[in-house]
């Protein structure tokens, strides 16, 4: 284990649930995080901000929080700002990194300006003429395309579009979830990877091979036929290079401590970064525990390591 006296952490809230589209995932993550912290002797308690006012954290003597909320106010900087106000230390990125990390549109703008490779894309606003925009976008980017709300996680409302005719309906559906919709050129030929970031841990890349078209919500949290390849199949030099770029992609957004950076490789082996996740899932299907397990770090040790970053 970490060798840290559990009493140093004081009373810890595991933030879970919330009211985003990812509530059920967060509840699952939070329950496991809670058990992992308790297994290490830490005084940890569940706290669902959808059911209790945040002021109760201060009133009840919590001194730090493990943020297992996903999406919405749990990941967009709002919870982080409130915790800063109450003087409660918390896991993960601060206000700026959280806000940028959840916003795929502004993430891509920052990456374009800082030399992080990311797929070509267009944006569509809720209420636009979807048929007209679809025609313009296909002319610029071709097909296949990925359509996704700018600020949802866990692949909520993400659709792979293979024909121009299917694009208007996909735009309309995604716009129900966010006023900004990202339409991204699909990067084909080299596979999907994730880089898990956790303080100074050197975690391996994971190659993700879903049984279906792409790594959607079902593949992430329900299916048992998604393959997670560790080692990922890249040579050591390439893996080290892509981990370095992933860390920079994380850092230029102001993200800190821990999270994930997801990317695709094209047929020539060039990386294209898709998004970061500043509050990654911690369910039994989730990627950070898998990466940690591959280098001999158990679940409880991982969550204690993440929480220990709040002691600095």
Swiss-Prot record:
Cell wall formation. Its cofactor is Mg(2+); Mn(2+). Mg(2+) 2 binds at residues 275, 277. It is found in: Cytoplasm. Its main location: cytoplasm. This is D-alanine--D-alanine ligase. Transmembrane segments: none annotated. The keyword Magnesium applies. ATP binds at residues 138-193. Keywords: ATP-binding, Cell shape, Cell wall biogenesis/degradation, Cytoplasm, Ligase, Magnesium, Manganese, Metal-binding, Nucleotide-binding, Peptidoglycan synthesis. Its EC number is 6.3.2.4. Residues 108-308 form the ATP-grasp domain.
């Amino acid at each position: 284990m970490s060798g840290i006296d559990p009493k140093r952490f004081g009373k810890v809230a595991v933030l879970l649930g919330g009211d985003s589209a990812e509530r059920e995932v967060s509840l699952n993550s939070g329950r496991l995080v809670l058990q992992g912290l308790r297994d290490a002797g830490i005084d940890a308690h569940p706290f669902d901000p959808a059911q209790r006012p945040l002021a109760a954290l201060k009133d009840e003597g919590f001194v730090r929080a493990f943020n297992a909320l996903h999406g919405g106010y749990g990941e967009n900087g709002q919870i982080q700002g409130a915790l800063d106000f109450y003087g409660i230390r918390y896991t993960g990125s601060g206000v700026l990194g959280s806000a940028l990390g959840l916003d795929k549109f502004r993430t891509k703008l920052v990456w374009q300006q800082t030399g992080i490779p990311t797929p070509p894309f267009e944006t569509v606003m809720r209420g636009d003429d979807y048929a007209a925009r679809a025609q313009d976008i296909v002319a610029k980017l071709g097909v296949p395309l990925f359509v996704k709300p700018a600020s949802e996680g866990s692949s909520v409302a993400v659709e792979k579009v293979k024909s121009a005719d299917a694009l208007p309906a996909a735009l309309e559906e995604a716009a129900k979830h966010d006023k900004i919709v990202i339409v991204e050129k699909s990067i084909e030929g080299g596979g999907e990877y994730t880089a898990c970031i956790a303080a100074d841990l050197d975690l391996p890349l994971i190659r993700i091979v879903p049984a279906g078209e792409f790594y959607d919500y079902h593949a992430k949290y329900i299916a048992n036929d998604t393959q997670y390849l560790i080692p990922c199949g890249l040579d050591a030099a390439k893996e080290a290079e892509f981990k370095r770029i992933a860390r920079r992609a994380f850092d230029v957004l102001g993200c800190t401590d821990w999270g994930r950076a997801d990317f695709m490789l094209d047929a020539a082996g060039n990386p294209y970064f898709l998004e970061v996740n500043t509050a990654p899932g911690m369910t039994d299907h989730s990627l950070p525990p898998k990466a940690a397990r591959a280098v001999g770090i158990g679940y409880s040790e991982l969550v204690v390591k993440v929480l220990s970053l709040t002691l600095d």
